[in-house]
């Protein structure tokens, strides 16, 4: 019985090839659209939900108006960290963040501009539970002469992730020692485009953090 139904269905499809093609194309487009919508919704619902301490984290932005346009900026003014900790004792930990410029990095005769990076406090890695391939989470980003790389950037510069202790020249003026290598950051994290992190102490040393 089932075989007869299948034969009849095929005959009808062959008799109405144009109509059949339209239906098949419509079905395919509908299925692809449904899958894409599902993936988009999943990405939105999982965005920044990958951290173990998600329910304890709060990202603070600074609202400003320029030329009549109001925006929210996520760079942190220098005094904010100490002031917030003093004003709100319930804050267990805090890290400031300032986006870096596109530094020129040099190792031997290799030079590259890796793109996005950020200056952060020492507590940053632990707060967001970013997984380390190498390095001591309790001690990295403590010195102004350190840098933490992602796995991808470490491989691009050194060809390996076993690079703790190796030195990178920044903009031909600063020598920084690699203190840790992070696993590549997932695409559903706000830090997905960051390929390195620098200590806030380094930012203070070079004088970028005078905003108040």
Where do the PLM segments sit?
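A short amphipathic helical element positioned immediately N-terminal to and/or at the very start
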Residues: 5-14
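Membrane-interface anchoring determinants
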Residues: 11-12, 20, 40, 76, ...
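Short, strongly hydrophobic transmembrane alpha-helices
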Residues: 16-45
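Membrane-proximal extracellular/periplasmic loop immediately following the first transmembrane helix
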Residues: 37-103, 212
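Short acidic/polar micro-motifs at solvent-exposed secondary-structure junctions
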Residues: 62-73, 96-123, 133-147, 171-173, ...
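Mid-to-C-terminal secondary-structure elements
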Residues: 121-134, 147-212
């Amino acid at each position: 019985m089932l075989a007869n139904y299948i034969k009849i269905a095929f005959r009808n499809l062959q008799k109405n090839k144009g109509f059949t093609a339209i239906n098949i194309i419509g079905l395919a487009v509908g299925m692809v659209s449904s899958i894409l919508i599902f993936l988009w919704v999943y990405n939105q619902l999982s965005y920044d939900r990958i951290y173990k301490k998600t329910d304890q984290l709060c990202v603070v932005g600074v609202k400003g108006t320029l030329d009549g346009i109001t925006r929210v900026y996520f760079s942190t003014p220098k005094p904010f960290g100490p002031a917030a900790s003093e004003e709100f004792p319930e804050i267990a930990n805090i890290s400031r963040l300032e986006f870096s410029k596109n530094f020129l990095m040099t190792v031997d005769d290799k030079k590259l501009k890796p793109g996005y990076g950020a200056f952060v406090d020492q507590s940053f890695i632990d707060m967001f539970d970013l997984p380390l391939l190498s390095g001591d989470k309790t001690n990295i980003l403590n010195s102004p002469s350190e840098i933490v790389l992602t796995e991808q950037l470490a491989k691009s510069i050194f060809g390996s992730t076993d690079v703790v202790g190796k030195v990178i020249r920044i903009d031909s003026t600063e020598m920084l020692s690699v203190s840790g290598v992070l696993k590549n950051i997932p695409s559903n994290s706000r830090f997905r485009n960051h390929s390195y992190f620098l200590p806030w102490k380094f930012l203070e040393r070079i004088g970028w953090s005078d905003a108040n």
